[in-house]
Amino acid sequence: MDFEAVIGLEVHAELSTNTKIYCGCTTEFGGQPNTHVCPICLGLPGSLPQLNKRVVEYGIKAGLALNCSINKVCRMDRKNYFYPDCPKNYQITQDEVPICRDGYIEIELENGEKKKIGIERIHMEEDAGKLLHTNAGTLVDYNRAGVPLIEIVSRPDIRTPEEATKYLEKLKSILSSIEVSDCKMEQGSLRCDGNISVRPVGSEKFGVRSEIKNMNSFKALEKALSYEYDRHVEAVTKGEILEQETRRWDEANSVTVLMRSKEKANDYRYFPEGDLVTLNISDEWIEEVRKTIPELPHEKAERFVNEFGIPKYDAMVLTLTMDMAKFFEETAVKSEDAKAASNWLMGDISRLMNEKTIEVKDLKFNPEQLAQLIKLINARTISNNIGKKVLDDMFKSGKNPKDIVEEKGLVQNNDEGAILEVVKKIIENNPQSIEDFKNGKKRALGFLVGLVMKETKGKANPQIVNKLVSEEANKM
């Protein structure tokens, strides 16, 4: 019997506001423990919350970007639970009437087909504090308590771990592009829980689901869902009874581990938050927010394909972050060579950034300098290989490529006569390579080309070298 996964994701995104959702404390990441707190976010008696207007605006903005309808009348609710990281012993969230409903994200599958993943709801809520477990006991830092979140709940439309990853990547790119969240998974500002069950292919009935936590990267999400799918299929095949439970992903051992049996909604005893009034959102307010939404990543990718003629894959990669998209577009326009701009950014520049763990905004050179490098190569002033060395220098120093080329004497030699003299000398000194070539070993020419490039210290035009080596070898 063949099985399919039924997957839904719950994504928490910390909002990029300066202050917390119900008080004026800073949301800045880091800081000494328990220094970004006040009576409101500590839940002290007599303190009253006041809803941050910017949080509501960001909730509306996210909803519009994700094709949701906005609930014009919504309210905040109390979710009651007892845990050390929740100082009030309840969380102010939204239950029955969230700010957004019924949206979707469109992802592209491996076969090129597009698939809509439904979004059931988006609701606003506050984050909890952070627990630090030590040998001496458990410490609590409430700096994060009260930081504003939106929780984006997908419908169970996802069928594979790969689809789940594509959905989360697309969601992350949209949220960061509209600047409602910085989506830094390593800092916990984008967190994802997954719900998964399995059922026979063709069945409409849902199986018993597990919720998986602690998936703090795209790789962890895919591996955890794959592991849990295999675990469910094995259990069902053996006739074992699965129970609804919450599990966490153990990265070190690549397994999911039981945390607790899954709670039900009524375990939290939701009821309306009496200290906050019902929220009324006007059409005028919605339209004001709509005007602040920039070109979305998938829209930008489509424009890049049409305007610059680059492949769809390149456009999708370049628009994963708006900083990269902006850098590419400026370089493409200034260099008048969009494909070269794409190749440099997706290739050598991305490699250098990964090695140093930096982002596009941290680069020491700008699009105009990269465009200048591309023009030097296209004008045959330097070779592509020399260009890579110049880029390394630009990456370290931020110098202009023209200055680097002049300082280091890297101008390409395009003089066929001068190069021919070197080619003849190399061939004369390597008769065995000519014999190998005559005997059908084509690699022998590559060896000779390499010697010529070494002799000219990489300055000879590679195209001219290849042509002359081939011509001279065929004369022998």
From Swiss-Prot:
Keywords: ATP-binding, Ligase, Nucleotide-binding, Protein biosynthesis. InterPro entries: Asn/Gln-tRNA_amidoTrfase_suB/E, Asn/Gln-tRNA_Trfase_suB/E_cat, Asn/Gln_amidotransferase, Asn/Gln_tRNA_amidoTrase-B-like, GatB, GatB_C_1, GatB_Yqey_C_2, Gln-tRNA_amidoTrfase_suB_CS. It catalyses: L-glutamyl-tRNA(Gln) + L-glutamine + ATP + H2O = L-glutaminyl-tRNA(Gln) + L-glutamate + ADP + phosphate + H(+); L-aspartyl-tRNA(Asn) + L-glutamine + ATP + H2O = L-asparaginyl-tRNA(Asn) + L-glutamate + ADP + phosphate + 2 H(+). The keyword Transferase does not apply. SMART domains: GatB_Yqey. The keyword Nucleotide-binding applies. Its EC number is 6.3.5.-. One of its GO terms (biological process) is translation. It holds the Pfam family GatB_Yqey. GO terms for molecular function: asparaginyl-tRNA synthase (glutamine-hydrolyzing) activity; ATP binding; glutaminyl-tRNA synthase (glutamine-hydrolyzing) activity. Allows the formation of correctly charged Asn-tRNA(Asn) or Gln-tRNA(Gln) through the transamidation of misacylated Asp-tRNA(Asn) or Glu-tRNA(Gln) in organisms which lack either or both of asparaginyl-tRNA or glutaminyl-tRNA synthetases. The reaction takes place in the presence of glutamine and ATP through an activated phospho-Asp-tRNA(Asn) or phospho-Glu-tRNA(Gln). Belongs to the GatB/GatE family. GatB subfamily. Heterotrimer of A, B and C subunits. This is Aspartyl/glutamyl-tRNA(Asn/Gln) amidotransferase subunit B. It comes from Clostridium botulinum (strain 657 / Type Ba4). The gene is gatB.
